[in-house]
Curated annotation (Swiss-Prot):
Topological type in the membrane: Multi-pass membrane protein
Domain of life: Bacteria
Binding residue positions for chlorophyll a: 687, 695
Residue sites binding chlorophyll a' per the record: 679
Cofactor binding note from Swiss-Prot or TrEMBL: PSI electron transfer chain: 5 chlorophyll a, 1 chlorophyll a', 2 phylloquinones and 3 4Fe-4S clusters. PSI core antenna: 90 chlorophyll a, 22 carotenoids, 3 phospholipids and 1 galactolipid. P700 is a chlorophyll a/chlorophyll a' dimer, A0 is one or more chlorophyll a, A1 is one or both phylloquinones and FX is a shared 4Fe-4S iron-sulfur center.
Cellular compartment(s): Cellular thylakoid membrane
Annotated positions binding [4Fe-4S] cluster: 577, 586
Main location: membrane
The protein's name: Photosystem I P700 chlorophyll a apoprotein A1
Alphabetical UniProt keywords: 4Fe-4S, Chlorophyll, Chromophore, Electron transport, Iron, Iron-sulfur, Magnesium, Membrane, Metal-binding, Oxidoreductase, Photosynthesis, Photosystem I, Thylakoid, Transmembrane, Transmembrane helix, Transport
Positions of transmembrane segments: 72-95, 158-181, 197-221, 293-311, 351-374, 390-416, 438-460, 535-553, 593-614, 668-690, 728-748
Cystines in this chain: none
Length: 754
C-alpha cells in the first residue's frame, strides 16, 4: 500500500450528462430502431431472427464505449426489476395459494405446497393431499425453509414482502430510465474501478451482510427459537415487538439486558448466547444453527467493510489497481515478460473481458453452493425434503454450467472485438496466446487419457459381469480401486476443525464424518463413504469437464486466428465457414465453440446430477429405526451397480424412471406428460442439428412456388434459417428438452420416495 501526495491523484468526481437521450415511445415502437438496416423493416423472414440476435448486442449498435456502458448499466436495472417481479410472485403465491401457516405447525408431516390447479379439464388430479387438509402441487424450491429461517410466521407478512418486491421493481425500472435518459454517468465513472470496488465490497457485500446479520439476530433468532421449542406461530411476538422491546429478547438471550455495554467495553464474549460457534446441525430442524449463521454474517460483514476501504480514491491512501497489475511481473518460470502490464486497460475498456472473468468465478461459486446445500443444509427442515435437496443441487449445478460456458463466450467475443495485440506485447495474456498450441495439445492429451482410462474401466467391468466373472471386476468386493486421496481429504476435513476451530462443538459437515443426523425418523445428513464406484464416476467427471474446458479454451485462444484461418478476426465472432471454395473450414468461429461447449457442459453435468441423485438415495437418504439402523432408499445398491454401464441403465435410469413412467392417473401425472414432452423437444432439436441449410432452402422454394401458383405469395420473402441460426435453435431445444426430461424424471422420483 502506498500513501501518495494529494496533488498526484486526479480527484474522483461523479460526472453525468443531463438528458443525453430523449425517451421516445414513438421511436421504441418501431421494430429494429437500434439498427439502420433493421429499421427499414422486413424484406425477408431473416429480419425477425436478426432482430432478436442484435437487440441486445450493443456493440453492433454503436462503437461509442460510453454509450455501450450506459446501455449495459441501464439494462442491469431492467434485469433487477424482472428479478423483483419474479420474487414478488413467489412470495405472493406463498401468501395466497400456499399451506405455509399449516406447514409451520407440523413441518415434518405436512409437505410444502404453493400452487393450486384449477380443474378446467380435470387437472384437479394434480392437487395432491399434502397433509393438514390442504390439496395442491408439492413445491421443491425450498422457499418454505428460507421463510421459516427468516422468521415469517403468517401469510400477511408474505403479502407485505410481495408488495415490497413490486415497489422495488418499480424503483429499478425508474432507475434504469433515469440513468440512461435523464442523468447518465460519463465513461470515467464506469472506469473508476477503485470507487467501484470500495462501494461493492463495503456497501453491497459488507453492509448487505451486516443488514442480514441484524435481521437474523433481532428477528430470525427469537422467532426460530420459539418455533423450535414448540410455541405456536400465532403466539409468537411479531418482528417489530422483538426489535423495539429488548426485554422480550432478554428472556430468550440474557445478554440483551446489558445492551451495548459489552460491545464498547470489548467484553464481546457476553454475546455468545446468540453469536455462537457450535458447528454441526440443529437436532430439531436438521439445519445449520441460526446463531452460527448470524455470527458468520456478522464476521463476513466486518471483513468486507474492511476490504471496502482498501482502494485509493480521493484520500491518497490505499491500493491503486493499475499499480498492482502493472507491478505484478508474474512467475519468471512460466509467465515472465511484462507480467500483468496492460491488463488494467483491457479490463477497463472491454466489458466482455470483465464479464468473462466474473462469469467464470460466479459459475464456479454456484457449483460450490450446490455442494454446500446438502453437506451443510442452511435452512430448517430442508435436509429431510429429498425432492428439494435434489432440485437445489441440480439447479445450482446447471446455473453454474451455463455461466461458465458464458465465460467462454464472452472471452471469445473479447478476443475478436476488443483485443488489441499492439497493447498486449509480451504480457501474461500475450504469452498465454503464444503458448496456445502447447496448452491445447496438452489438454487434448489429458482428455484422451481420461476418456480411454475411465471408459476402459467401465468396459472391463461390463465385460466381466457379462461373462459371469465378478471376481475379476473393479469393485469394493473384488479388485478394489479405493479413492484414497478423497478419503484422506474427507478425514482431514473431519479432524481439522479440532485444531483450527477448537471452540466449535461439532464438525462443519457430517458428510465428512461423525454421526447420522435424523429428523422425524428421516436421515438429514450422514457421513458419505466413498468407494470404487465413486472413483470410477469421478474420472468420468474429470474427463467430461476437461473436454468442456478444452472446447471453450480453444474457442477463446483461437478466436482471432489459427493456422487454418489466419484472418479469423475479420470474420467476426460468429460465422459458419470461411466462405465458398474453402471446404473443411466450418465450425471454427468463437460462436461454434460455445455451441459445442454447451453440449459437453450438459453432458458433463448430467453425469454429476445423476451421480448425486443415485449416491444420496443409495448411501445417505432413508429412514432411521428407533434402534438407530438406517434403511436407505435404494438399499446401498450404488457401490455394486454404478460400476457397470449396464448397472447405470438398469438400476438407475430404468428402475428410477418407473415413477415417472407409471405416473398417469396420479397427482404426479403432469410429470409423466412433461417427461414425454421433454423427449419430444429433444428429438425436435435433432432435426435442426442433423440437416443442412440447403435442404430447407430447397424445400421452402418449392413451397413458395406453390403459393405463387395459387396467387397467395407473401410480401415478406421466406428464407431458411442461416446455418448459425439453425444451430442456435438446435442447441436451445436440445438443452430445453434435456432439462425438462431430467426435471420430470427427478421430481416424480423424489416426490414418490417422500
Amino acid at each position: 500500500m502506498t500513501i501518495s501526495p494529494p496533488e498526484r491523484e486526479a480527484k474522483v468526481k461523479v460526472t453525468v450528462d443531463t438528458d443525453p437521450v430523449p425517451a421516445s415511445f414513438e421511436k421504441w415502437g418501431q421494430p429494429g430502431h437500434f439498427s439502420r438496416t433493421l429499421a427499414k423493416g422486413p424484406k425477408t423472414t431473416t429480419w425477425i431472427w436478426n432482430l432478436h440476435a442484435d437487440a441486445h448486442d450493443f456493440d453492433s449498435q454503436t462503437s461509442d464505449l460510453e454509450d455501450v456502458s450506459r446501455k449495459i448499466f441501464s439494462a442491469h436495472f431492467g434485469h433487477l426489476a424482472v428479478i423483483f417481479v419474479w420474487l414478488s410472485g413467489m412470495y405472493f403465491h406463498g401468501a395466497r395459494f400456499s399451506n405455509y401457516e399449516a406447514w409451520l405447525t407440523d413441518p415434518t408431516a405436512i409437505k410444502p405446497s404453493a400452487q393450486v390447479v384449477w380443474p378446467i379439464v380435470g387437472q384437479g388430479i394434480l392437487n395432491a393431499d399434502v397433509g393438514g387438509g390442504f390439496h395442491g402441487i408439492q413445491i421443491t424450491s425450498g422457499l418454505f425453509y428460507l421463510w421459516r429461517a427468516s422468521g415469517f410466521t403468517n401469510s400477511y407478512q408474505l403479502y407485505c414482502t410481495a408488495i415490497g418486491g413490486l415497489v422495488m421493481a418499480g424503483l429499478m425500472l425508474f432507475a434504469g430510465w433515469f440513468h440512461y435518459h435523464k442523468k447518465a454517468p460519463k465513461l470515467e465513472w464506469f472506469q473508476n474501478v477503485e470507487s467501484m470496488m470500495n462501494h461493492h465490497l463495503a456497501g453491497l457485500l459488507g453492509l448487505g451482510s451486516l443488514g442480514w446479520a441484524g435481521h437474523q439476530i433481532h428477528v430470525s433468532l427469537p422467532i426460530n427459537k420459539l418455533l423450535d421449542a414448540g410455541v405456536a406461530a400465532k403466539d409468537i411476538p411479531l418482528p417489530h415487538e422483538f426489535i423495539l422491546d429488548s426485554s422480550k429478547m432478554a428472556e430468550l438471550y440474557p445478554s440483551f439486558a446489558q445492551g451495548l455495554t459489552p460491545f464498547f467495553t470489548l467484553n464481546w464474549g457476553v454475546y455468545s448466547d446468540f453469536l455462537t460457534f457450535k458447528g454441526g446441525l440443529n437436532p430439531v430442524t436438521g439445519g445449520l444453527w441460526l446463531s452460527d449463521t448470524a455470527h458468520h454474517h456478522l464476521a463476513i460483514a466486518v471483513l468486507f467493510i474492511i476490504a471496502g476501504h482498501m482502494y485509493r480514491t480521493n484520500w491518497g491512501i490505499g491500493h491503486s489497481m493499475k499499480e498492482i497489475l502493472d507491478g505484478h511481473k508474474g512467475d519468471p518460470l512460466l509467465f515472465g515478460g511484462e507480467g500483468h502490464t496492460g491488463l488494467y486497460e483491457v479490463l477497463t475498456t472491454s466489458w466482455h473481458a470483465q464479464l468473462a472473468i466474473n462469469l467464470a468465478l460466479l459459475g464456479s461459486l454456484s457449483i460450490i453452493v450446490a455442494h454446500h446445500m446438502y453437506a451443510m443444509p442452511p435452512y430448517p427442515y430442508q435436509a429431510i425434503d429429498y425432492g428439494t435437496q435434489l432440485s437445489l443441487f441440480t439447479h445450482h449445478v446447471w446455473i453454474g454450467g451455463f455461466l461458465i460456458v458464458g465465460a467462454g463466450a464472452h472471452g471469445a467475443i473479447f478476443m475478436v472485438r476488443d483485443y488489441d495485440p499492439a497493447k498486449n506485447v509480451n504480457n501474461a495474456l500475450d504469452r498465454v496466446i503464444r503458448s496456445r498450441d502447447a496448452i491445447i495439445s496438452h489438454l487434448n492429451w489429458v482428455c484422451i487419457f481420461l476418456g480411454f482410462h475411465s471408459f476402459g474401466l467401465y468396459i472391463h467391468n461390463d465385460t466381466m459381469r457379462a461373462l459371469g466373472r465378478p471376481q475379476d471386476m473393479f469393485s469394493d468386493t473384488a479388485i478394489k480401486l479405493q479413492p484414497i486421496f478423497a478419503q484422506w481429504v474427507q478425514n482431514l476435513h473431519f479432524l481439522a476443525p479440532g485444531g483450527t476451530a477448537p471452540y466449535a462443538g461439532a464438525p462443519a459437515s457430517y458428510a465428512f464424518g461423525g454421526e447420522t443426523v435424523a429428523i422425524a425418523g428421516k436421515v438429514a445428513i450422514m457421513p458419505i463413504a466413498l468407494g470404487t464406484a465413486d472413483f470410477m464416476v469421478h474420472h468420468i467427471h474429470a474427463f467430461t469437464i476437461h473436454v468442456t474446458v478444452l472446447i471453450l479454451l480453444k474457442g477463446v485462444l483461437y478466436a482471432r486466428n489459427s493456422r487454418l484461418i489466419p484472418d479469423k478476426s475479420n470474420l467476426g465472432f460468429r460465422f459458419p465457414c470461411d466462405g465458398p471454395g474453402r471446404g473443411g473450414t466450418c465450425q471454427v468461429s468463437g460462436w461454434d465453440h460455445v455451441f459445442l461447449g454447451l453440449f459437453w457442459m450438459y453432458n458433463s453435468l448430467s453425469i454429476v446430477i445423476f451421480h448425486f441423485s443415485w449416491k444420496m438415495q443409495s448411501d445417505v437418504w432413508g429412514t432411521v429405526a428407533p434402534d438407530g439402523t438406517v434403511s436407505h432408499v435404494t438399499g446401498g445398491n450404488f457401490a455394486q451397480s454404478a460400476i457397470t454401464i449396464n448397472g447405470w441403465l438398469r438400476d438407475f435410469l430404468w428402475a428410477q424412471a418407473a415413477n415417472v413412467i407409471n405416473s398417469y392417473g396420479s397427482a404426479l401425472s403432469a410429470y409423466g406428460i412433461m417427461f414425454l414432452a421433454g423427449h419430444f423437444v429433444f428429438a425436435f432439436s435433432l432435426m435442426f442439428l442433423f440437416s443442412g441449410r440447403g435442404y430447407w432452402q430447397e424445400l421452402i422454394e418449392s413451397i413458395v412456388w406453390a403459393h405463387n401458383k395459387l396467387k397467395v405469395a407473401p410480401a415478406i420473402q421466406p428464407r431458411a434459417l442461416s446455418i448459425i441460426q439453425g444451430r442456435a435453435v438446435g442447441v436451445a431445444h436440445y438443452l430445453l428438452g434435456g432439462i425438462v426430461t431430467t426435471w420430470a424424471f427427478f421430481l416424480a422420483r423424489s416426490l414418490s420416495i417422500g
